[in-house]
Amino acid sequence: MAGRAGRTRPRTLRDAIPDCALRSQTLESLDARYVSRDGAGDAAVWFEDMTPAELEVIFPTTDAKLNYLSRTQRLASLLTYAGPIKAPDGPAAPHTQDTACVHGELLARKRERFAAVINRFLDLHQILRG
Protein backbone atom coordinates (compact mmCIF):
# COMPACT_ATOMS: atom_id res chain seq x y z
CA MET A 1 0.00 0.00 0.00
CA ALA A 2 1.32 3.41 -0.85
CA GLY A 3 0.88 6.28 1.58
CA ARG A 4 0.07 9.88 0.71
CA ALA A 5 3.74 10.86 0.54
CA GLY A 6 4.61 7.98 -1.82
CA ARG A 7 6.13 5.80 0.89
CA THR A 8 4.74 2.41 1.84
CA ARG A 9 2.86 2.04 5.10
CA PRO A 10 3.79 -0.68 7.58
CA ARG A 11 1.56 -3.74 7.59
CA THR A 12 0.60 -3.44 11.26
CA LEU A 13 0.53 -0.74 13.89
CA ARG A 14 3.17 -2.73 15.75
CA ASP A 15 5.57 -2.01 12.89
CA ALA A 16 4.65 1.70 12.90
CA ILE A 17 4.79 2.46 16.63
CA PRO A 18 8.23 2.37 18.29
CA ASP A 19 8.53 0.38 21.52
CA CYS A 20 9.55 3.48 23.49
CA ALA A 21 6.33 5.23 22.40
CA LEU A 22 4.26 2.20 23.44
CA ARG A 23 5.77 2.31 26.91
CA SER A 24 5.72 6.06 27.46
CA GLN A 25 2.53 7.39 25.83
CA THR A 26 -1.12 6.99 26.73
CA LEU A 27 -3.54 5.08 24.55
CA GLU A 28 -5.29 8.32 23.57
CA SER A 29 -2.07 9.97 22.38
CA LEU A 30 -1.05 6.84 20.44
CA ASP A 31 -4.50 6.75 18.84
CA ALA A 32 -4.33 10.42 17.85
CA ARG A 33 -0.83 10.09 16.43
CA TYR A 34 -0.88 6.73 14.63
CA VAL A 35 -4.50 5.95 13.66
CA SER A 36 -5.77 7.76 10.58
CA ARG A 37 -9.26 9.22 10.71
CA ASP A 38 -9.69 9.48 6.93
CA GLY A 39 -9.51 5.69 6.44
CA ALA A 40 -6.76 5.96 3.81
CA GLY A 41 -4.67 2.81 4.18
CA ASP A 42 -4.72 2.37 7.93
CA ALA A 43 -2.35 -0.20 9.31
CA ALA A 44 -3.86 -3.35 10.74
CA VAL A 45 -4.30 -3.81 14.48
CA TRP A 46 -2.35 -6.65 16.07
CA PHE A 47 -3.08 -8.88 19.05
CA GLU A 48 -0.33 -10.56 21.02
CA ASP A 49 -0.58 -14.35 21.09
CA MET A 50 -0.08 -15.27 24.72
CA THR A 51 -0.61 -19.01 24.27
CA PRO A 52 2.13 -21.14 25.88
CA ALA A 53 4.27 -23.12 23.44
CA GLU A 54 2.99 -26.42 24.86
CA LEU A 55 -0.60 -25.51 23.98
CA GLU A 56 0.49 -24.53 20.46
CA VAL A 57 1.46 -28.18 19.95
CA ILE A 58 -1.86 -29.48 21.28
CA PHE A 59 -4.10 -26.77 19.77
CA PRO A 60 -2.43 -25.55 16.54
CA THR A 61 -5.44 -23.67 15.14
CA THR A 62 -7.28 -20.65 16.50
CA ASP A 63 -10.52 -22.63 16.41
CA ALA A 64 -9.04 -25.35 18.61
CA LYS A 65 -7.75 -22.75 21.09
CA LEU A 66 -11.16 -21.09 21.29
CA ASN A 67 -12.85 -24.46 21.84
CA TYR A 68 -10.36 -25.21 24.61
CA LEU A 69 -11.05 -21.86 26.28
CA SER A 70 -14.80 -22.43 26.02
CA ARG A 71 -14.55 -25.89 27.57
CA THR A 72 -12.33 -24.71 30.42
CA GLN A 73 -14.69 -21.81 31.16
CA ARG A 74 -17.59 -24.26 31.28
CA LEU A 75 -15.62 -26.54 33.58
CA ALA A 76 -14.80 -23.61 35.86
CA SER A 77 -18.46 -22.65 36.09
CA LEU A 78 -19.43 -26.28 36.76
CA LEU A 79 -16.90 -26.53 39.55
CA THR A 80 -18.11 -23.25 41.00
CA TYR A 81 -21.87 -23.66 40.74
CA ALA A 82 -22.58 -27.41 40.55
CA GLY A 83 -22.92 -27.95 44.29
CA PRO A 84 -26.09 -29.49 45.72
CA ILE A 85 -29.10 -27.21 46.24
CA LYS A 86 -29.77 -27.01 49.95
CA ALA A 87 -31.92 -24.72 52.05
CA PRO A 88 -29.76 -22.30 54.07
CA ASP A 89 -31.20 -23.43 57.43
CA GLY A 90 -33.21 -26.41 58.48
CA PRO A 91 -34.22 -29.46 56.45
CA ALA A 92 -34.07 -29.71 52.69
CA ALA A 93 -36.73 -27.79 50.82
CA PRO A 94 -39.41 -29.82 48.96
CA HIS A 95 -37.74 -29.21 45.58
CA THR A 96 -34.32 -30.46 46.74
CA GLN A 97 -33.13 -33.95 47.55
CA ASP A 98 -30.64 -35.23 50.09
CA THR A 99 -29.08 -37.51 47.46
CA ALA A 100 -27.47 -36.27 44.29
CA CYS A 101 -29.82 -35.91 41.34
CA VAL A 102 -29.16 -37.37 37.89
CA HIS A 103 -27.89 -34.02 36.63
CA GLY A 104 -25.42 -33.78 39.50
CA GLU A 105 -24.17 -37.28 38.79
CA LEU A 106 -23.71 -36.45 35.10
CA LEU A 107 -21.81 -33.29 35.98
CA ALA A 108 -19.61 -35.24 38.39
CA ARG A 109 -18.82 -37.84 35.71
CA LYS A 110 -18.02 -35.15 33.14
CA ARG A 111 -15.83 -33.39 35.69
CA GLU A 112 -13.93 -36.62 36.38
CA ARG A 113 -13.45 -37.32 32.66
CA PHE A 114 -12.23 -33.78 32.03
CA ALA A 115 -9.83 -34.02 34.99
CA ALA A 116 -8.45 -37.28 33.56
CA VAL A 117 -7.88 -35.66 30.15
CA ILE A 118 -6.19 -32.63 31.73
CA ASN A 119 -3.96 -34.95 33.78
CA ARG A 120 -2.90 -36.70 30.57
CA PHE A 121 -2.10 -33.33 28.99
CA LEU A 122 -0.08 -32.37 32.06
CA ASP A 123 1.81 -35.67 31.85
CA LEU A 124 2.53 -34.97 28.18
CA HIS A 125 3.65 -31.46 29.14
CA GLN A 126 6.15 -32.93 31.63
CA ILE A 127 7.45 -35.34 28.98
CA LEU A 128 7.88 -32.55 26.40
CA ARG A 129 9.63 -30.30 28.89
CA GLY A 130 11.65 -33.16 30.43
From Swiss-Prot:
Keyword check for Metal-binding: no
Keyword 4Fe-4S: no
GO biological process: viral DNA genome packaging
GO CC terms in record: host cell nucleus
Name of one Pfam family that matches: Herpes_UL33
Subcellular location: Host nucleus
InterPro entries hit by this protein: Herpes_TT2
Keywords from the named record: Host nucleus, Viral genome packaging, Viral release from host cell
Family membership: Belongs to the herpesviridae TRM2 protein family.
Stated role: Component of the molecular motor that translocates viral genomic DNA in empty capsid during DNA packaging. Forms a tripartite terminase complex together with TRM1 and TRM3 in the host cytoplasm. Once the complex reaches the host nucleus, it interacts with the capsid portal vertex. This portal forms a ring in which genomic DNA is translocated into the capsid.
Assembly and binders: Associates with TRM1 and TRM3 to form the tripartite terminase complex.
Protein name according to UniProt: Tripartite terminase subunit 2
Organism: Human herpesvirus 2 (strain HG52) (HHV-2)
